Structures are given as structure tokens and as C-alpha cells.
Amino acid sequence: MKLRPMQDRIIVKRVEEETKTAGGIFIPETAKEKPMEGEVVAVGNGKRTEDGKVLPLDVKVGDKVLFGKYSGTEIKVEGQDFLIMREDDILGVIEK
């Protein structure tokens, strides 16, 4: 199944968090916090202005992004977890 977000929404896949600390201690699932970092896997066409123009999004597929702890709506597609959020929920893009 292919999922295409509408307007200024994007689909993000969270990055996998380390299960072991630098000191070698394993972190159980119940103690982990969900990461606030992910990779953009799909983007909408853009945000529509009041006069009907479409402004393209700044983020693109493949960008690594940071977002707020409670941003987006969690969805599951074919067994994989994703977040759908608006571009405004993105706090920044991680550049290498």
C-alpha cells in the first residue's frame, strides 16, 4: 500500500532508538521514551494560501527531522509505525 499525505502534511518514520547505553546497560522497552527524530518518507503537495496558491514544502523525502514530543498522529501501515504531521510541527532538519 502506498500512502500519500495531503496538502502540508508529511509522513515520518521514527528512527530506532539504541537499546543499550554507552556503559553497556540494556534499556527495557518500558523505560524507553519515543524518539523525537525521524526520516521523512512522504510529503504532500504544499500549503494552500488564502488566494489559492500552493506554497511548496521546505522538507523533502529523505530528510532527517526533529519534532515535538507530542507532534503528529501515529498510524500503522503494513506493520510499520509512522507519524503524520504538518510541516509546522517540524522543529528542524538535521544536516550532515
UniProtKB/Swiss-Prot annotation:
GO terms for molecular function: ATP binding; metal ion binding; protein folding chaperone; protein-folding chaperone binding; unfolded protein binding. Its main location: cytoplasm. The keyword Cytoplasm applies. It is found in: Cytoplasm. One of its GO terms (biological process) is chaperone cofactor-dependent protein refolding. Together with the chaperonin GroEL, plays an essential role in assisting protein folding. The GroEL-GroES system forms a nano-cage that allows encapsulation of the non-native substrate proteins and provides a physical environment optimized to promote and accelerate protein folding. GroES binds to the apical surface of the GroEL ring, thereby capping the opening of the GroEL channel. Heptamer of 7 subunits arranged in a ring. Interacts with the chaperonin GroEL. Belongs to the GroES chaperonin family. NCBIfam families: PRK00364.1-2, PRK00364.1-5, PRK00364.2-2, PRK00364.2-4, PRK00364.2-5. This is Co-chaperonin GroES.
